[in-house]
Amino acid sequence: MRTEWNALADEVVAGPNMLPGVVEAWWRHLGKGRLRVVVARDGAGRLVGLAPLHERVLVGRPVVRWVGHGMGAVGELLLRPASAHEAAEAIWTHLADTDRVVLQLVEYRHGGGGLDELRRSDRWQVTAELRDYCPYIDIRGQASAAELLAEPGRRKLRQNMARVDRAIIEERTGLRVHVLTTPAEIDAVIDELSVVHDNAEQAQERLHFLRGARRDFTLDALRSTAADGRLLLVLLRQGERPVGFHVALVTGDTAFAWLARFDPVAAALAPGHVMLRELVDLATARGLDTVDLQLGDDPYKLRWSSGAYDTFGVLAAAPGRLATARATASAIAFARRQAGRFHRH
């Protein structure tokens, strides 16, 4: 089914965490409970809908979530446009196999596939709250990052990049950009990526994707998406020292930012901007329409962005059981906070 899944992902421009290479890697290395990749097919047997989900029993209830829950996975159902309504209804009906199940779909994309059908379903009672947003860069009609920066509304960013370029030249920093796209290239630099990530985490603790089981997941996902021809990895070196990396995965007409970190030692050289400029150049060279920067309001993202879309936390349960679902979600959140407190001490 992998070939069909990839084709559907390209047709509907699925986000990076909805891709088979990422889903399979996550389940192999980080998955718990039961994998539930729910599919819908039309009368001819063609794949028309897919939901990459998993189910865990938490505080005594089966809870269904996106694959990649807790790692910034923006989700939606993958639905072929001509059959979207029917496919979404079939998927939501299938998931309502017991009135005890809770859907906890964090970071559901605003307007994302299947959301309207879930809200209108008589099998589910739904609540949603605004959670975050994803900036994006519209590069339609642009031939390069330089052309994008020449737009009248980007004067401050253009001046900032000019200062960075002068500093790189005048200070002879030896800053170099490398682009990696193949599994072999990933294997050759994975230790360098780990060094950058270690240094970034020491300065600001976030979530380390290159340590322990998450390292196994990340490396597996990078290899798999590279083999599928989706990977764009920008590696920044200062002399021989790696100081930054930015991973993007291409789906349809969009390059989605997936993971980026930089070493604070290079902060004065604006590595986030330098790598993003390279990513825009790579995307325009491929004839893509959009660079989706995914979750977060990092300043370097906002300076480049053309717009943004929202994400929602969606909670759903059988009619009459939403209050119980809310209590379940609260208990899960409390248990997670307690576990985090115990881990710190």
Language model features: what each stretch is:
Residues L95-G113:
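ATP-hydrolysis module of ASCE/P-loop NTPase motor domains
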Residues M1-V64, E107-C134, D138-A268:
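A conserved beta-strand-loop-helix scaffold within acyl/acetyltransferase catalytic domains
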Residues G33-L35, S83, D97-V102, L231, ...:
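Short, high-confidence coil segments that cap the C-terminus of an alpha-helix
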Residues E117-A146, L232, L288-H345:
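Active-site/acyl-donor-binding loops of N-acyltransferases
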Residues M71, D99, T127-R131, E171, ...:
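A short, structural micro-pattern
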Residues V102-L105, H178, T290-D292:
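Short catalytic-loop micro-motif centered on adjacent basic/acidic residues
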